[in-house]
């Protein structure tokens, strides 16, 4: 039974990792919660407009795409991107999930970012762009996680 549970947990984690692709950002919130539970990590959720929001694009370019952030995130966070693009196509299922999350977290602007526990409970949050590059952003996340 123990080996069976280990195998199932591994499958869930590997499936979630496959969904994440090279960027490390998941788009399936429920899969992210399962991965967070399995890996005992908090969730870092990013509400964004990847193809129209200037501050979101700047944050991606200057922080999230950088090796320093990606290495920290890989070891300490489960990343979730909740995107509201204007030009990029999304499945009806993804649109419905994102709309539900937008309402649940009462999003009023982009980017909005939260740290959540594995159950989806909000630990802390930020609205807007934070300057300073990946090193400053990682330090900010470390401070938030200490609380």
Predicted segments with their positions:
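Positively charged n-region of N-terminal signal peptides that target proteins for export
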Residues: 1-5
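Bacterial N-terminal signal peptides
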Residues: 7-15
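Sec/Tat signal peptide C-region and signal peptidase I cleavage site
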Residues: 16-22
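A short beta-strand-turn-helix
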Residues: 25-43, 73
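Thiol-based oxidoreductase modules, predominantly thioredoxin-like and allied folds used
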Residues: 25-26, 69-95
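Short active-site neighborhood of thiol/selenol oxidoreductases, capturing the structured segment around
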Residues: 40-53
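Typically the conserved alpha-helix immediately C-terminal to a functionally engaged Cys/Sec
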Residues: 55-72
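Non-catalytic, surface beta->alpha helical segment in thiol-disulfide oxidoreductase systems
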Residues: 62, 104, 108-147
């Amino acid at each position: 039974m123990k080996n069976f549970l280990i195998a199932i947990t591994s499958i869930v984690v590997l499936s979630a990792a496959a969904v994440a692709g090279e960027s490390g950002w998941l788009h399936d919130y429920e899969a992210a919660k399962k991965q967070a539970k399995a890996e005992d990590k908090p969730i870092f959720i990013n509400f964004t407009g990847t193809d129209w929001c200037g501050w979101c694009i700047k944050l991606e370019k200057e922080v999230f795409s950088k090796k320093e952030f990606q290495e920290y995130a890989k070891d300490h966070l489960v990343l979730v991107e909740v995107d509201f693009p204007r030009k990029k196509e999304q499945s009806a299922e993804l649109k419905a999930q994102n709309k539900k999350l937008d309402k649940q977290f009462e999003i009023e602007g982009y980017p909005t970012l939260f740290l959540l526990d594995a159950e989806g409970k909000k630990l802390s949050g930020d609205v807007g762009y934070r300057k300073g590059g990946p090193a400053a952003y990682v330090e900010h996340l470390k401070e938030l996680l200490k609380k």
